[in-house]
């Protein structure tokens, strides 16, 4: 197979995904197009050489519908020959977009492609796309569906992570994110977002709360307790996992990923097009893997996917110096570290989505750029 290189990564700062957030007035199309323009301008790209643009988006409806990737290439003034496609693999969408772009280059069907994602959670809220799990009781019943927040609480209950454990992890995420910004670790990848007048509206991650403490988090109420008790989701979880005595609802707004707006792009290509265009590779992609996990607990999947990818690449855990895992909920990362025996000092060293936020379709490409 052809070697594939990462030539550049860019992302927006993450804006609070609320009407008062700095990016609320910026449409998802503008977010995506601005990052495509940045990739082009930073690398002096002849965009006719880009074979495809693949974007993750978890709520591909409304302003994010109608194949936002293709339209964004046109809005970014890319050559009309550049194709575009939107994909949805939930929170892995941005990473899967990069994987798909990589696969096209690996197999020789493309020389250069862009993978990334976009999500304006303030303008197109979670759940806007509906779906059978949320609307068809027969589907939810057959698959033992529960919302992800309760899945995270199930993980905490099954493996004994206390409220103090998850809160302590969240505080460390905030500290690491703040330190990373202070040390300008993101300066090469974060591109400020501009309004239609060309004025920069945001140039830093808006969601961070570096002043948070264990004491301040202790005052937050669990986010999923009422839902679990009143809508039968706790009973569903316990039916599927009878070894768990009860669901301890330990997750709340302070130790879960933040709702934010943002976009990200990753430029990948083979060696020959990089040399022809004068590009310097930042990294080589050895391989990737996907896996489906049991859908009730679902959030244990990352460790299985990581192990599968290591096997495919002929590598061991000891070969990995730094790990990045989306901080959807604190217990997810705690379980990943325990399952793979990873030291906390080797994972999410720049902070993560608990501190900086999780723009659903874009985060996977964002954390790849961080790594």
Segments and roles (model prediction):
Residues 28-44, 68-72, 97, 149-155, ...:
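Short, well-ordered amphipathic alpha-helical segments that serve as non-catalytic structural scaffolds
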Residues 10-13, 24-34, 42-44, 168-276, ...:
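N-terminal extracellular/periplasmic Venus flytrap/periplasmic-binding protein-like
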Residues 57-110, 143-150, 218-258, 339-371:
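Conserved catalytic cysteine-centered active-site region
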Residues 269-319, 337:
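Glycine- and Gly-Pro-enriched alpha-helical subdomains that act as flexible
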Residues 87-118, 156-186, 265-272, 338, ...:
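Active-site-proximal alpha-helical scaffold in enzymes
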Residues 22-113, 118-134, 190-203, 296, ...:
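Conserved beta-ketoacyl condensing-enzyme motif
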Residues 1-34, 93, 97-129, 136-148, ...:
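Conserved beta-strand-centric core segments of catalytic alpha/beta enzyme folds
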């Amino acid at each position: 197979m052809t070697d594939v290189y990462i030539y550049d990564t860019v992302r927006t700062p993450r804006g609070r995904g609320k009407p008062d957030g700095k990016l609320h007035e910026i449409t998802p199309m503008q977010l995506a197009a601005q990052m495509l323009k940045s990739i082009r301008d930073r690398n002096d790209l002849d965009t006719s050489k880009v074979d495809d643009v693949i974007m993750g988006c978890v709520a591909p409806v409304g302003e994010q519908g109608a194949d936002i990737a293709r339209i964004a290439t046109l809005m970014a003034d890319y050559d009309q020959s550049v194709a575009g496609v939107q994909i949805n693999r939930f929170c892995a969408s941005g990473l899967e977009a990069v994987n798909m772009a990589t696969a096209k280059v690996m197999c020789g069907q493309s020389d250069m492609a862009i993978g990334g994602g976009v999500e304006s959670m303030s303008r197109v809220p979670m759940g806007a796309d509906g779906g059978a799990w949320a609307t068809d009781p027969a589907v939810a019943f057959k698959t033992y569906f529960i919302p992800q927040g309760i899945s995270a609480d199930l993980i905490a209950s099954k493996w004994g992570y206390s409220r103090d454990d998850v809160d302590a992890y969240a505080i460390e995420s905030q500290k690491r994110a703040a330190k990373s910004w202070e040390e300008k670790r993101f300066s090469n990848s974060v591109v400020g977002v501009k309004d239609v007048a060309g004025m920069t509206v945001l140039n830093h991650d808006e969601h961070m709360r570096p002043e948070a403490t264990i004491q301040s988090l202790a005052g937050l109420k669990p986010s999923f307790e009422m839902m679990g008790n009143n809508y039968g989701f706790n009973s569903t979880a316990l039916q599927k996992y009878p070894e768990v005595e009860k669901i301890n609802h330990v997750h709340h707004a302070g130790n879960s990923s933040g709702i934010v707006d943002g976009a990200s792009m990753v430029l990948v290509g083979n060696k020959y097009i990089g040399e022809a265009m004068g590009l310097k590779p930042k990294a080589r992609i050895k391989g990737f893997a996907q896996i489906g996990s049991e859908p009730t607990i679902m959030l244990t999947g990352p460790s299985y996917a990581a192990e599968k990818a290591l096997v495919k690449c002929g590598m061991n855990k000891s070969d990995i110096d730094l790990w990045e895992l989306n901080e959807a909920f604190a217990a997810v990362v705690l379980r990943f570290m325990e399952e793979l025996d990873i030291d906390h000092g080797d994972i999410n060293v720049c902070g993560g989505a608990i501190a900086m936020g999780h723009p659903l379709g874009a985060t996977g490409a964002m954390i790849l750029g961080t790594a």
